[in-house]
A protein has these predicted regions:
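Interfacial loop-to-helix junctions that mark the boundaries of transmembrane helices
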Residues: 3, 84-92
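Transmembrane alpha-helix interface/packing and boundary motifs in multi-pass membrane proteins
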Residues: 14-20, 102-112
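Multi-pass membrane catalytic core of lipid/isoprenoid biosynthesis enzymes
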Residues: 51-78
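Interfacial segments of multi-pass membrane proteins
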Residues: 50-54, 76-80, 100, 119-137
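N-terminal signal-anchor transmembrane alpha helix
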Residues: 6-31
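Transmembrane helix boundary and interhelical junction motifs in multipass membrane proteins
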Residues: 20-26, 114-120, 136
Length: 137
C-alpha cells in the first residue's frame, strides 16, 4: 500500500514536470531568436506565438502543449494494474494529474515560473481522460 502512495506521488510530480516544459519559450529562442514572454501578451503559450510569430510557429507549440497534458494523464493508466487502485481512485488521480500538468504549464519550473495560460495543455489532458468531450468544444 505504501508503494502505491509513492507511485501516485511520482505520477503527480511527473505530470507537473511534463507541464513545466516551456515549449513556446524553447521554440521561440531556438528557431526565432526571441523570448516570447517579452512580446505580445507576454505569455509563453500558443496564442501569443500565433499573434507574434504566426501559424508556422504556433502549430508545434500547440502540439507540444497538447501532448504535455495528454501524456501526463495517460501515464496514470499504469496505476490501474496496482491491486489497491480502484476505478474511483484512478479517476481522482487523473484529475490531480490534469491539475499538476496545467499548473506546471502556468508556473513552469524550467522557465522561472512564468508560463502560459494552460489552455492547450488542458485540452490535451481532457482528451486523455475522455476524448468525445473535446469534440463538443
Amino acid at each position: 500500500m505504501i508503494l502505491t502512495y509513492y507511485c501516485i506521488i511520482t505520477m503527480i510530480i511527473i505530470a507537473y514536470l511534463l507541464g513545466s516544459i516551456p515549449s513556446a519559450v524553447w521554440i521561440g529562442k531556438k528557431y526565432y531568436g526571441i523570448d516570447i514572454r517579452e512580446h505580445g501578451s507576454k505569455n509563453a503559450g500558443t496564442t501569443n506565438m500565433l499573434r507574434v510569430l504566426g501559424r508556422r510557429a504556433a502549430l508545434p507549440v500547440f502540439l507540444l502543449d497538447f501532448l504535455k497534458g495528454f501524456v501526463a494523464v495517460t501515464l496514470t493508466e499504469i496505476l490501474k494494474y496496482d491491486a489497491y487502485i480502484t476505478d474511483m481512485w484512478l479517476i481522482n488521480i487523473k484529475i490531480i494529474a490534469v491539475f499538476a500538468a496545467v499548473l506546471g504549464h502556468i508556473f513552469p519550473i524550467f522557465a522561472g515560473f512564468r508560463g502560459g495560460k494552460g489552455v492547450a495543455t488542458l485540452v490535451g489532458a481532457i482528451t486523455g481522460i475522455y476524448p468525445p468531450v473535446v469534440l463538443l468544444c
